[in-house]
Amino acid sequence: MPAGGLIVAIDGPSGTGKSTTSRALATRLSAKYLDTGAMYRVATLHVLNQGIDPADSAAVIAATAVLPLSISDDPASTEVLLAGVDVQKDIRGPEVTQNVSAVSAIPEVRENLVALQRALAAKAHRCVVEGRDIGTAVLVDAPIKAFLTASAEVRAQRRFDQDTAAGRDVDFDAVLADVVRRDELDSTRAASPLKPADDAHIVDTSDMTMDQVLDHLIHLVEASAERSNQ
């Protein structure tokens, strides 16, 4: 594996295996891991906890201007703190999932969190950064960019299985409808819409195992290192 500074940007919608693969890749590369999606989920939870309507942009901006957020960059840790309390389970709940697109679409919210994301990546020096706009907005100069995708049905099934395993009472059709709805919101928002960077490698994970996706990403990292050494 290449040593020294390294930034890998991994983007894509939910249900593509992005988080699991990004954590595994960071571990293989002995790198830090930054889940930017979790940061938007924490912001959404913070808004909901205060009884604010996510559609009230002014109130959301005010509530998230100073966010008491702390997130681990250890790929083996899922700890996410809001005001000192670990909320990693709460931010994956249905209410946050239904509202995170609305909160993250607000330009001022994105500006604040993007500044934090850039600072954390720079501090880590060697980091796998996962999100929806890393290659297109947050770290546009990242030497390695991958965009993971999969069909809506496959992604809905993965989320349904994940929620069921976590003991949540979910309906597949409702999960699929939410996946389609969120895709529409994320890809059409004015601020940093979800789309591949022009220089991103597109990886369709629909029929791939996590190990296959991981091997593919490692190949991209190694190929990038070889080009840099030429």
Swiss-Prot record:
Top EC group: transferase
Q: Where does ATP bind?
A: G12, P13, S14, G15, T16, G17, K18, S19, T20
What are the transmembrane regions? Answer: none
What EC numbers are recorded for this enzyme? Answer: 2.7.4.25
Q: Which keywords describe this protein according to UniProt?
A: ATP-binding, Cytoplasm, Kinase, Nucleotide-binding, Transferase
Gene Ontology molecular function, alphabetical: ATP binding; CMP kinase activity; dCMP kinase activity
Main subcellular localisation: cytoplasm
GO CC terms of this entry: cytosol
What InterPro entries does UniProt report for this protein, alphabetically?
A: Cytidylate_kin, Cytidylate_kinase_dom, P-loop_NTPase
Q: Where does this one sit in the cell?
A: Cytoplasm
Q: Which GO biological process entries does UniProt record here?
A: nucleobase-containing small molecule interconversion; pyrimidine nucleotide metabolic process
User: Catalyses which reaction?
Assistant: CMP + ATP = CDP + ADP; dCMP + ATP = dCDP + ADP
What the entry lists under NCBIfam families is as follows: cmk (TIGR00017)
**HAMAP family per UniProt:** Cytidyl_kinase_type1
Q: Which PANTHER family match?
A: CYTIDYLATE KINASE, CYTIDYLATE KINASE/PANTOATE-BETA-ALANINE LIGASE
- Give the similarity note: Belongs to the cytidylate kinase family. Type 1 subfamily.
What protein does this entry describe? Cytidylate kinase
Origin species, per record, is: Corynebacterium glutamicum (strain ATCC 13032 / DSM 20300 / JCM 1318 / BCRC 11384 / CCUG 27702 / LMG 3730 / NBRC 12168 / NCIMB 10025 / NRRL B-2784 / 534)
